[in-house]
Regions:
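Beta-strand-rich modules
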Residues: 584-601
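Sec/Tat signal peptide C-region and signal peptidase I cleavage site
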Residues: 39-43
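N-terminal secretory signal peptides that target proteins for export/translocation
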Residues: 1-23
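Recognizes extended acidic, P/S/T-rich segments that occur
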Residues: 563-589
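Ser/Thr-rich, Proline-interspersed low-complexity disordered segments
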Residues: 513-531
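Pro/Thr/Ser/Gly-rich low-complexity, intrinsically disordered linker/stalk tracts
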Residues: 528-558, 602-614
């Protein structure tokens, strides 16, 4: 008789070896995609997905992007970049193929391009995917509607994946796989989502579902998220469809039980390498029963949703958010690690209610209070992707709200962590930020484009010191002005260049000098410890439940507590957390002059004046 235990040991040894080999390949792909210019110049640089990493952190490592070099950025006028169609999706950058490096860009006309990253000329193109939808949708704000979400690339198989909405007697979403080096459609693709995606007896309907978010590729399955069309029309649901890249006929899906619950954010599906995270919006006709909306959800491979409290979080006021159309899922999920915090592995949601929420991503907790929350915006948070990064000063997240403000907040390494204001810069457009660093720790710069002239955008590139918000790159001159930039879009970084895709064109920006070879050790940028008397105060007004409220944000104070003065009168003493909302009790026209001082002293900030016209 065979030794069954020995046989089991042989089988498990083989499986473990196979899993280790697969993990090594996947880890290498992720490593190559995330380290950018920190690698020697003979190593590959690849930007394969939305915000460069599955966590959607938006960080790009490129040794050339020191603050002094970044200040001299100019547009490469010799780069053509001509394409056809409107662009809402982030471009990608792929190396390692027979044609050399490529910029991959997709458009709402259902066109796909591979461009030479230096000359901007076409390497290959696909203009035969199918006609985009230009009419016949019950509502919406994207027309034509074709390829909206950012694609994803599998380097191992050299495959490009994207979702295209194609017009016809029946309007349909198709998930495509192309050879990234030639543009040819891979065998057994595309996948007809209408025909293959079902969940609990519910069929997918492209007429009700829009695809906006970036695709994710996790352990051999490509995940695509769906919302409704702008206007909340039709019987749409929040959907995540999973397609195994080696067996595309075996389609998996999950959807919200209630109508609504769309996944709206530009980042789409985030992942920790095993599980997927999405944030949903408002639902309808729930009779007060939570049914998948206004929530952070953790999905297992497939996708599979367990329904257990460990795998979802919704605020206790979710029903009020539903009633007010204040989607929790205004911004896509961002995974944040905070060394020293308890818990340290978090997921961020930024809601249309102007709040930020942090939740333990290893145990989301069900319907309960978050680990941390804060009012972080004087305008709606929606549509964009946030970023997260680490400097010598701590862990941050930053985002661009509907009012045009770029806001940065620090997450404290405490038990539990707290959200503390870091800096903000004045309004321009709605683009999603991204971050450069010379080595993963130093010289952090937050970049953003003031997208979409229809929403007050200046259509220029801007760069800010990631610790302080100080301007590093102010948009350039006449040559650096872009046109046709779309709200919520984001740029990428590769080989000492920034690429940003807009309507009918991909713009390339270059550093004034080549990326150093070999990569030098980056010089740390250290912010000095503030000394008394150097308190810097910012303030702006907002209405909170009709009450005149002055939002105060400061830096440089060293005392444990802060005295807050309004019009020369002490109105509050508060912990030194860098922020305080001064609720005046007034509702009409008024002017307020505020300052903050280290408690019990005359070491004070500048005075800020805030006017309320009515």
């Amino acid at each position: 008789m065979l030794d069954k235990n020995a046989t089991r040991r042989v089988i498990w040894t083989a499986l473990i070896s196979r899993r280790r080999m697969k993990f090594s390949i996947r880890f290498l792909s992720i490593l190559v995609a995330s380290v950018g210019g920190a690698l020697p110049t003979d190593a590959q640089v690849n930007v394969t997905q939305e915000h460069n990493n599955p966590s959607r952190d938006g960080v790009y490592i490129d040794a050339g992007f020191t603050p002094s070099a970044a200040a001299g950025l100019t547009r490469d006028l010799n780069s053509d970049g001509t394409i056809s169609g409107n662009v809402y999706a982030q471009p990608l950058y792929i190396e390692g193929g027979p044609n050399g490096p490529m910029i991959i860009v997709v458009t709402e006309s259902n066109n796909v391009y591979a461009l030479n990253p230096t000359t901007g000329t076409v390497i290959w193109q696909r203009t035969d995917i199918g006609p985009p939808v230009t009419s016949g949708l019950p509502c919406g704000n994207i027309s034509p509607a074709g390829i909206t979400g950012t694609p994803v690339v599998d380097l191992a198989s050299r495959s490009l994946f994207f979702d295209a909405l194609i017009d016809g007697p029946t309007k349909k979403h198709f998930i495509y796989s192309l050879n990234v080096d030639t543009g040819a459609t891979n065998p057994n693709w595309p996948v007809d989502v209408n025909a293959t995606a079902t969940y609990n007896g519910m069929a997918f309907s492209s007429l009700a579902q829009e695809e906006r978010g970036g695709l994710a590729l996790v352990n051999g399955i490509v995940y695509v998220s769906y919302s409704g069309y702008a206007g909340d029309c039709g019987l749409y649901h929040g959907w995540v469809v999973g397609v195994p890249i080696n067996n595309p006929s075996n389609v998996g899906a999950w959807a919200t039980t209630a109508i609504g619950g769309g996944i709206w954010g530009h980042g789409g599906v985030a992942s920790d390498g095993t599980n997927m995270f999405v944030v949903t919006g408002n639902t309808f006709n729930t009779a007060g029963n939570w049914m998948g909306g206004e929530a952070i959800l953790r999905l297992q491979a497939g996708p599979i949703f367990t329904g257990q409290p460990t795998d979802y979080w919704a605020p206790t006021n979710w029903l009020n958010l539903d009633s007010g159309d204040l989607d929790l899922g205004g911004v896509s999920a961002t995974l944040i690690n905070v060394p020293g915090a308890t818990p340290s592995k978090l997921v961020l949601a930024l809601g249309k209610d102007q709040n930020a929420y942090l939740v333990d991503r290893n145990n989301l907790g069900g319907i309960t209070a978050p680990i941390a929350s804060a009012n972080v915006s004087n305008a709606t948070n929606r549509g964009t992707s946030a970023v997260t990064y680490h400097t010598s000063q701590g862990t941050y997240f930053a985002f661009h709200n509907d009012g045009g403000w770029v806001e940065a907040y620090r997450v404290t390494a405490t038990n539990p962590p707290k959200i503390v204001s870091a800096w903000s810069v004045p309004p321009s457009g709605r683009g999603s930020p991204w971050v450069t660093t010379t080595d993963g720790k130093n010289n952090m710069i937050v970049w953003v484009v003031g997208t979409d002239a229809n929403y007050g955008g200046d259509q220029r590139l801007h760069g800010y010191d990631a610790d302080t918000g100080a301007v590093i790159y102010a948009g350039g001159g006449a040559n650096e002005l872009m046109s046709g930039t779309r709200q919520w879009n984001t740029g990428i970084v590769a080989r000492g260049r920034i690429y940003f895709a807009a309507d009918n064109k991909v713009y390339a920006f270059k550093l004034p000098t080549p990326t150093p070879t070999p990569t030098p050790t980056a010089t740390p940028t250290i912010t000095p410890t503030p000394t008394p008397g150097q308190i810097t105060l910012r303030g702006r007004g907002k209405k909170v439940h009709l009450i005149n409220t002055v939002r105060l944000r400061w830096s440089g104070a060293t005392s444990a507590n802060i005295d807050v003065y309004r019009n020369g009168v002490l109105v509050a003493t508060t912990p030194n957390e860098g922020q305080y909302d001064d609720s005046t009790g007034d509702t009409g026209q008024a002017q307020y002059m505020d300052k903050v001082c280290e408690a019990g002293t005359q070491t004070c900030s500048n005075v800020v004046t805030v006017n309320f016209p009515q």
